[in-house]
Swiss-Prot record:
The modification Phosphothreonine is found at residue 433. It comes from Synechocystis sp. (strain ATCC 27184 / PCC 6803 / Kazusa). It catalyses: L-seryl-[protein] + ATP = O-phospho-L-seryl-[protein] + ADP + H(+); L-threonyl-[protein] + ATP = O-phospho-L-threonyl-[protein] + ADP + H(+); ATP + H2O = ADP + phosphate + H(+). The modification Phosphoserine is found at residue 432. NCBIfam families: circ_KaiC (TIGR02655), PRK09302.1 (NF006799). Its cofactor is Mg(2+). The interaction with KaiA enhances its phosphorylation status, while the interaction with KaiB decreases it. This is Circadian clock oscillator protein KaiC 1. In the homohexamer the 2 domains (called CI and CII) self-associate to each form a 'donut' layer; the compactness and local conformation of the domains varies over the cell cycle and impacts function. CII has the autokinase and autophosphatase activities, both CI and CII have (weak) ATPase activity; CI has the clock pacemaker role. Keywords: ATP-binding, Biological rhythms, Hydrolase, Kinase, Magnesium, Metal-binding, Nucleotide-binding, Phosphoprotein, Repeat, Serine/threonine-protein kinase, Transcription, Transcription regulation, Transferase.
Length: 519
């Protein structure tokens, strides 16, 4: 049960092994820290109110006790032990049982509610001795301190704060414990800590943020430094679930998933022919177009075909209710309720604004892990993009597509464009590069009548039809016809009819080229 002792590296007769780490078993945290926290060192966790500092400190101890049987010590300067124990219950962590078993000890250093007056020179000697006594008595390997700001907020001299924090960190290192020390900051992107000195006396610094982006809050974590070892750079989104902190280390994702040559049907025979025999299994398809062009219809046919093949499927809907989806599908001869009754289909409908993108991503991953579908659909991505930054939205899409490919799932997503007719950007967030197949749907005005057009704009690794097909929607679903004949500039929104003379001239030129080639 003894951890590797880092201070042995300082002995001349012991070969250097580098900084060794202990896994935190916090979802995603070990990935961005390249293996966990350095053993025998103190990590400063800084953040504004509500970022999850206390939760991280408690979860660090709980996971260490639960997975590795390392005794832990929690030192609280703010909340009472009873509040900490009660709050932990909401995550399924029975701290009282760990205390009764002698695996966890909570040292109550919270302030006297009646107030206290400081007289003379301030130092932490008595507190440091209490911590040392508790560490040795309970043989603690892990220590969490929450938070040092509460101790020093009534003292103005930065030199005193620096001196006492340095003494505390030095004693923890001498005791050979791996510790987390939380501190508050005033701004999300300002000074790292309240007093401006905490980060300089700590070996490692982790910054938690809770930033208002657009109309939603977004939590991120950044590893500012891990002294003597490597870590991932930048901010990574995280959410707080019933299991605690869950980080999405998108930068740690590797493009190592297998690619299948097997084809699956879209549920529309003509569309399969346009795609060279159907979609690739485990590929990501994006149908983009104005409202009413038939995107949800293509999604419904895609899901229906999967259920017909006895495959499981999930539809994540962010614009329509379950009743509305079922009603619309029935008008095309698709019975969603029967598929659900057979256990082949799952409809999940929610408003995009009901949660942050990280929460939606976590929910999608959890549902996929539980239901184990072969096909998933999201209708629509553009609904989720409302009120968030392009970068946050792109990270969300990368998280979904990366997880789907990892699980070898075929994904069909829709995107609603803001222009009703004419040329338009496929997506505003450049997510088109992440998808494997793009179906472009749009309206076309021909001789005063409105028609629909469909084009396989892109399909990685496969031949596909380059033509712009006309299609209509009937009670059987989409009816894809031949390409628009005698018309050009359809995608631009200004279709122009090619005259007979122009056609004859083009034919003559083509025949001339063929004759010269034959000679």
């Amino acid at each position: 049960m003894n951890l590797p002792i880092v201070n042995e590296r300082n002995r001349p007769d012991v070969p250097r092994k580098g900084v060794q780490k202990i896994r935190t078993v916090i979802e995603g945290f070990d990935e961005i820290t390249h293996g966990g926290l350095p053993i025998g060192r103190t990590t400063l966790v800084s953040g504004t109110s509500g970022t999850g500092k206390t939760l991280l400190a408690v979860q660090f101890l709980y996971q260490g006790i639960h997975h590795f049987d390392y005794p832990g010590l929690f030192i609280t300067f703010e909340e009472s032990p009873s509040d900490i124990i009660e709050n932990a219950y909401s995550f399924g962590w029975d701290l009282q049982q760990l205390i009764d078993d002698g695996k966890l000890f909570i040292l109550d250093a919270s302030p006297d509610p009646e107030g206290q007056e400081v007289v003379g020179t301030f130092d932490l000697s008595a507190l440091i001795e209490r911590i040392q006594y508790a560490v040795r008595k309970y043989k603690a390997k892990l220590v969490s301190i929450d938070s040092v700001t509460a101790v020093f907020q009534q003292y103005d001299a930065a030199s005193v704060v620096r001196r006492e924090i340095f003494r505390l960190v030095a004693r923890l290192k001498q005791l050979q414990v791996t510790s987390i020390m939380t501190t508050e900051r005033v701004e999300e992107y300002g000074p790292i800590a309240r007093f401006g000195v905490e980060e300089f006396v700590s070996d490692n610094v982790v910054v938690l943020r809770n930033v208002l982006e657009g109309e939603r809050r977004r939590r991120t974590v950044e590893i500012l430094k891990l002294r003597g070892t490597t870590h991932m750079k930048g901010e990574y989104p995280f959410t707080i679930t019933h299991d605690g902190i869950n980080i999405f280390p998108l930068g740690a994702m590797r493009l190592t998933q297998r690619s299948s040559n097997a084809r699956i049907s879209s549920g529309v025979q003509t569309l399969d022919e346009m795609c060279g025999g159907g979609f690739f299994k485990d590929s990501i398809i994006l149908a983009t177009g104005a409202t009413g062009t038939g995107k949800t219809l293509l999604v419904s046919k895609f899901l229906q075909e999967g259920c017909r093949q006895r495959e499981r499927a999930i539809l994540f809907a962010y614009e329509e209710s379950r009743a509305q989806l079922s009603r619309n599908a029935s008008s095309w001869g698709i019975d969603f309720e029967e598929m659900e009754h057979k256990g082949l289909l799952k409809l999940l409908c929610t408003y995009p604004e009901s949660a942050g993108l990280e929460d939606h991503l976590q929910m999608i991953k959890s549902e996929i892990s539980e239901f184990k579908p072969s096909r998933i659909a999201i209708d629509s991505l553009s609904a989720l993009a409302r009120g968030v930054t392009n970068n946050a939205f792109r990270q969300f899409v990368i998280g979904v597509t990366g997880y789907a490919k990892q699980e070898e799932i075929t994904g069909f997503f829709t995107n609603t464009t803001d222009q009703f007719m004419g040329a338009h950007s496929i997506t505003e967030s450049h997510i088109s590069t992440i998808t494997d197949t793009i179906l472009m749907l749009q309206y076309v005005e021909i001789r005063g009548e409105m028609s629909r057009a469909l084009n396989v704009f892109k399909m990685r690794g496969s031949w596909h039809d380059k033509g712009i097909r006309e299609y209509s929607i009937s009670h059987d679903g989409p009816d894809i016809r031949d390409s628009f004949r005698n018309y050009e500039r359809i995608i631009s929104g200004s279709p122009t009819r090619i005259s007979v003379d122009e056609k004859s001239e083009l034919s003559r030129i083509v025949r001339g080229v063929k004759d010269k080639t034959a000679e």
